[in-house]
Amino acid sequence: MTPGEVRRLYFIIRTFLSYGLDELIPKMRITLPLRLWRYSLFWMPNRHKDKPLGERLRLALQELGPVWIKFGQMLSTRRDLFPPHIADQLALLQDKVAPFDGRLAKQQIEAAMGGLPVEAWFDDFDIKPLASASIAQVHTARLKSNGKEVVIKVIRPDILPVIKADLKLIYRLARWVPRLLPDGRRLRPTEVVREYEKTLIDELNLLRESANAIQLRRNFEDSPMLYIPEVYPDYCSEGMMVMERIYGIPVSDVAALEKNGTNMKLLAERGVQVFFTQVFRDSFFHADMHPGNIFVSYEHPENPKYIGIDCGIVGSLNKEDKRYLAENFIAFFNRDYRKVAELHVDSGWVPPDTNVEEFEFAIRTVCEPIFEKPLAEISFGHVLLNLFNTARRFNMEVQPQLVLLQKTLLYIEGVGRQLYPQLDLWKTAKPFLESWIKDQVGIPALVRALKEKAPFWVEKMPELPELVYDSLRQGKYLQHSVDKIARELQSNHVRQGQSRYLLGIGATLVLSGTFLLVSRPEWGLMPGWLMAAGLVAWFVGWRKTR
């Protein structure tokens, strides 16, 4: 380890111990040296004994900085890893840190724009940041070319070495989990960290975020439900992104929305519709839709429109995942647990040798109590949570796209019910899901598939005679090869039969000769001839097996 990594490790250990997080170390024989070592660090006492463990963990992660904050946020969606009181605290982690010097941001912008001063590209650049988070910071300006208001997002300077050092330490912790926890191997901690690392590295590349925003904007062009600000790609690079500045009401400011005369019921329902449209129509969804990234337009409050920002994290589902997910939801709300179990096996989410009856019973045991509530109060996010947690007990592989989906659904559901507590999410989503499934099967789906494949077949049509001829020729060659193999197998079978026959005769002659040699010495050379003939027969039979 480098001196910098050693210093960072010392700071992390000191922070963990000052919040009493050594309580998380299980009391096992393998952890005894670790627990004894903790007692030797007597000058690092728990300074927050009055707070519960979950809150202490949250505060410690916030003190450790961006990597640990975002890691805690991701872990809050994996409720199979922690009890509820800890997972609930992790969900409260806020990605807010002190801003860095605006002059440094200005230097980074100038470096990204070829060394020219900021004034060559932008007017009214505000050295004071509009917002600051753990990964990046945002400043306002106007484009010199057309006078439009923009925001400039800049990656924090020197953050990459800190992220790499912290990730290395988190990987080491993850490798210890299977040794420390009886159920640690099933939780696949290294895969969890690998998934987190990918998400974090993606966030550090603002070109990727720019591309995501452009795609989402195109998907919802002219939509009455969602607006994505325009990105100016000519000004974007890995460390800098320039996009249209928007003005809206934060979705969490319910009082301001009501004061503006917003149709809260329609707004809540549109949030659900936006989510399911992204997932099932576009197969491309904004996976970081927490309240800080969602605004509502001031215009047309009777016909409200969301504004989405910060598209660094997106998710996608393939066609099979979408179908299985939609059918899972419908089967669950119809209480068809057998269908839910079969869908998990058919999709490959759980191993093919899973006992479907046991899996069905486990799902029923966990999920049936949910239906004690009125349907309008049932949480889609917690339905997914219960299903995935149960499936993990049956060795469900970690599905990163489903983890992102579950997190996003929990955000959307929370926002929707904050806006309109009577929101019946199932009533809003069911017609969409049923319509989508209907559209994927039957005659309309077949006609659409034929239309989609028509250009391919038109292109291949001139090659069809040659392809048929090649297939016939390969078929004849294949038949010839099969016949040849069959003849060789038959010949081997005959040789094996002859071999066994000669080996049997040889063994019989050798045994007979030995018996006569012992019991009838007066027979002279006869026993010797029998033994010699037996050895010859045995040798010939052995050669045929070679």
UniProtKB/Swiss-Prot annotation:
The active site is at D288 (proton acceptor). GO terms for biological process: regulation of ubiquinone biosynthetic process; ubiquinone biosynthetic process. It is found in: Cell inner membrane. Signal peptide: none annotated. Coiled coil: none annotated. ATP binds at L130, A131, S132, A133, S134, I135, A136, Q137, V138, K153. InterPro entries: ABC1_dom, Kinase-like_dom_sf, UbiB, UbiB_bact, UbiB_kinase. Keywords: ATP-binding, Cell inner membrane, Cell membrane, Kinase, Membrane, Nucleotide-binding, Transferase, Transmembrane, Transmembrane helix, Ubiquinone biosynthesis. GO terms for cellular component: plasma membrane. Pathway: Cofactor biosynthesis; ubiquinone biosynthesis [regulation]. Its EC number is 2.7.-.-. Residues 124-502 form the Protein kinase domain. GO terms for molecular function: ATP binding; protein kinase activity. The chain crosses the membrane at residues 501-521, 522-542. Is probably a protein kinase regulator of UbiI activity which is involved in aerobic coenzyme Q (ubiquinone) biosynthesis. Belongs to the ABC1 family. UbiB subfamily. This is Probable protein kinase UbiB. It comes from Escherichia fergusonii (strain ATCC 35469 / DSM 13698 / CCUG 18766 / IAM 14443 / JCM 21226 / LMG 7866 / NBRC 102419 / NCTC 12128 / CDC 0568-73).
